[in-house]
């Protein structure tokens, strides 16, 4: 299971911990990923996706999974999310 959001493509970043004495040690910034079930109103079923907290807020802001996927770029979406987007286009 990779540490990448299935809807936005957000993944780990690298950087430094910086102490008060300005010592730098390498570290990773991991995305806040959660396993959530999102309901597709058009298809009438729910899908379990591993998405970031920011993506969950974006889905709510756009009015649900169907609206989010309609506007999302294909390059950012995972294979599973692309499959759902194609199913929505057919329906």
UniProtKB/Swiss-Prot annotation:
One of its GO terms (biological process) is translation. Residues 1-23 are annotated as: Disordered. It comes from the Bacteria. One of its GO terms (cellular component) is cytosolic large ribosomal subunit. InterPro entries: Ribosomal_bL28 (IPR026569), Ribosomal_bL28/bL31-like_sf (IPR034704), Ribosomal_bL28_bact-type (IPR001383), Ribosomal_bL28_sf (IPR037147). GO terms for molecular function: structural constituent of ribosome. Keywords: Ribonucleoprotein, Ribosomal protein. HAMAP family: Ribosomal_bL28. Belongs to the bacterial ribosomal protein bL28 family. PANTHER family: 39S RIBOSOMAL PROTEIN L28, MITOCHONDRIAL, LARGE RIBOSOMAL SUBUNIT PROTEIN BL28M. This is Large ribosomal subunit protein bL28. It comes from Paracoccus denitrificans (strain Pd 1222). The gene is rpmB.
């Amino acid at each position: 299971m990779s540490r990448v959001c299935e809807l936005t493509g957000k993944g780990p970043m690298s950087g430094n911990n910086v102490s008060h004495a300005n010592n730098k040690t390498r570290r990773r910034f991991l995305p806040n990923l959660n396993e959530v079930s999102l309901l597709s109103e058009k298809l009438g079923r729910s899908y379990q996706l591993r998405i970031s907290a920011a993506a969950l807020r974006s889905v709510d802001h756009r009015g649900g999974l169907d609206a989010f996927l309609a506007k999302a770029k294909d390059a950012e979406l995972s294979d599973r999310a692309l499959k759902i987007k194609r199913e929505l286009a057919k329906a």
